[in-house]
Every structure is written in structure tokens, then in C-alpha cells.
Regions:
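Hydrophobic transmembrane alpha-helices
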Residues: 2-10, 14-73
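Individual transmembrane alpha-helix segments
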Residues: 4, 263-286, 290
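Hydrophobic core segments of alpha-helical transmembrane domains in multi-pass membrane transport
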Residues: 17-29, 49-54, 119-122, 146-157, ...
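Membrane-interface capping segments at transmembrane-helix boundaries
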Residues: 29-34, 201-205, 288-301
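Alpha-helical membrane segments and adjacent membrane-interface helices in multi-pass membrane proteins
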Residues: 57-121
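Short helix-perturbing small/polar motifs within transmembrane alpha-helices
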Residues: 112-153, 157
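Glycine-rich ThDP/TPP pyrophosphate-binding loop and its adjacent helix/strand module
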Residues: 141-214, 218
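Juxtamembrane non-transmembrane "cap" segments at the membrane-aqueous interface
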Residues: 155, 238-264
């Protein structure tokens, strides 16, 4: 759902750059005031997990593929502001290091992928009573929140490219929302599964201001959590089919003559993406580990 450069008007791209930038600054101030230092490693680990998990594309209808977004999950675990800030870090890193989405369109991508999923998913989760639920009810509410947030995100994306003239608005809305009704099922299932698992093994992580401590066992589990998506990539591979937005933009009149979905999603681009993503996740892990060791050293008398 990452919009490349050249498909949004300057007015829409610029407006969303301002909105997303202001929201990031506000969220950063809120997180600094509201959270203790113990949340920083949790945010880092979850960012690395979402970054890695988003590389796992699975085939869906019509020769397209989809992947986990994770905004609702992060908002539920960290709160909407910290979840949005963590998701924004992932999307900005993808744009800067992997060329996944354009730089001019970065504000639009942060708005669609981060703001819409985090805030709408969290609002749905809380309004349905997810914060005080457990078991099957927690799983059901998590599924609904994850599924619905992806529909809102895809609708916003379609509206932006449709109003910009990249694709007819009616076609864009029906295609994006229709495909993401299917992708949202996977999003909802993964959101529900992770919430149910954490509710059983680490219920303190389900509370933003919970007393839980991020200890050695959590670090080991976090490494495993981040390694799992890469292990699946190596052993089973990931679908190289274009995602719904790439499929849609491949027939846009704004695309240069002769270009198509294969050019937007070539195997060379895929391997280059995989290598740089692996390097980036390793750097994230080393940075978090260095911060953790530094905190332990400074806490010693």
C-alpha cells in the first residue's frame, strides 16, 4: 500500500506531509511524557518484528499478494500514540533504505499505513470493550479491529490516488477495498492470534502502564520473534506477485509507456529489497541491544 512518487498531486502530497509530520511531532511529545524508559526496548522490538513480518507476502485473488501491516496490533499493545510512532519509524525506514514508497509521497504513506490503521483500529478495539476482555472475546474484537482498520487505510489510499487522477476513483475504491477485504482477514487473524498469545503469557504487556519488566527471557523471545519471518522467507519464500496498489497503478495513465506490474515488482528489486531489509533489521537489533546494555551498566551502583 506504499504509494510511489508521481501518482499524487503536489497539493495532496504536500498537505499529507504536513499532517503526518505534525502528528509525528505530537506523538513523540506525548510518548516522552507518558511512558517510562522501559517501553523503549518494547517499541524497538515490535518495530523490528513488523518490519520483518511485512516482507512476508502471501498470494490472494487476481494475481496479487498481501502482507501484514500491524498498525492495529501496535496501537493495542503500546497505545495509539506510541503505536503510531513505532509504525512511522518502520514506514520511514522502508522509504529511505528500501525505496518502498516515494519520498514525496511519504506523508501520504505515513497517514494511510500508520495513522489510519493505528487510530481507527485502536478506537474500534476500545469501543468494543477489547481493553477489558480476554479469551475468545479478545480474539474476536482484535480480529474485527485489524480487519476494519485495513479497509479504512485502503479506502484513504484509493481516495488520494483517485482524486489525483492516477486512476478513476470508482475503480480505485472498488479494487483497493475489495482486495483488502481479503487481506484484512489475514491481518485480523494475526492480530487476534498475537493478542491471545500475549494475554496468556505476558498480560502485563497488554497494559500500557503495566509493571512488567523487559528481562533476559524477553530479549531471547524477541530475537526469535524477529528471526521467524526471515526463516520463513528462506525456507518457504515469499510471494513475488504485486500487491493490490501496484497492480492498480500498473495500468495508470501516469505510468511511462511500456512499464507494468513486472517492472514495478521485478525479481532483481525483490532480492535487493530482501538483502537491505535483512541488514536494516540486524542494525535495529544491534542498536536495541546496545541501548539495553548501556541501561544495565548505568543502573549499576
Amino acid at each position: 500500500m506504499h504509494i510511489p512518487d508521481g501518482f499524487l498531486t503536489n497539493r495532496i502530497a504536500g498537505s499529507l506531509d504536513v499532517v503526518s509530520g505534525a502528528t509525528i511531532l505530537y506523538a513523540a511529545r506525548r510518548v516522552k511524557v507518558d511512558f517510562s524508559g522501559r517501553m523503549v526496548p518494547v517499541m524497538g522490538v515490535l518495530a523490528a518484528f513488523v518490519f520483518a513480518a511485512q516482507m512476508l507476502n502471501f498470494p490472494i485473488l487476481g494475481g496479487t499478494s498481501g502482507h501484514l501491516v500491524g498498525g492495529t496490533l501496535l496501537a493495542i499493545l503500546l497505545g495509539p500514540m506510541a503505536g503510531f510512532l513505532t509504525m512511522s519509524t518502520v514506514v520511514i525506514a522502508q522509504a529511505l533504505f528500501l525505496q518502498d514508497g516515494g519520498l514525496v509521497a511519504l506523508g501520504a504513506n505515513v497517514f494511510n499505513i500508520c495513522a489510519v490503521t493505528c487510530f481507527s483500529g485502536y478506537a474500534i478495539f476500545r469501543s468494543l470493550g477489547g481493553g477489558s476482555s480476554g479469551g475468545k472475546r479478545l480474539a474476536l474484537i482484535g480480529f474485527i479491529a485489524g480487519w476494519a482498520s485495513l479497509l479504512f487505510s485502503s479506502a484513504c489510499c484509493a481516495l488520494e490516488i483517485g482524486i489525483s487522477g492516477a486512476i478513476p476513483l470508482r475503480i480505485g475504491l472498488s479494487t483497493m477495498v475489495g482486495y483488502h477485504m481479503v487481506v484484512g482477514i489475514i491481518e485480523g487473524m494475526l492480530t487476534a492470534g498475537v493478542l491471545t498469545f500475549l494475554f496468556k503469557v505476558r498480560p502485563d504487556l497488554m497494559k500500557i502502564n503495566g509493571p512488567g519488566r523487559f528481562g533476559l527471557a524477553d530479549w531471547v523471545g524477541s530475537v526469535v520473534l524477529v528471526v521467524i519471518p526471515f526463516a520463513i522467507l528462506v525456507l518457504a519464500g515469499s510471494s513475488r506477485l504485486p500487491d493490490p496498489l501496484e497492480k492498480l497503478l500498473a495500468v495508470s495513465p501516469l505510468l511511462p509507456t511500456g512499464a507494468g506490474a513486472d517492472r514495478l515488482y521485478s525479481s532483481t528489486r525483490y532480492m535487493d529489497y530482501l538483502i537491505r531489509a535483512a541488514v536494516f533489521v540486524v542494525l535495529i537489533g544491534l542498536g536495541i541491544l546496545a541501548g539495553f546494555l548501556g541501561r544495565r551498566r548505568s543502573s549499576r551502583p
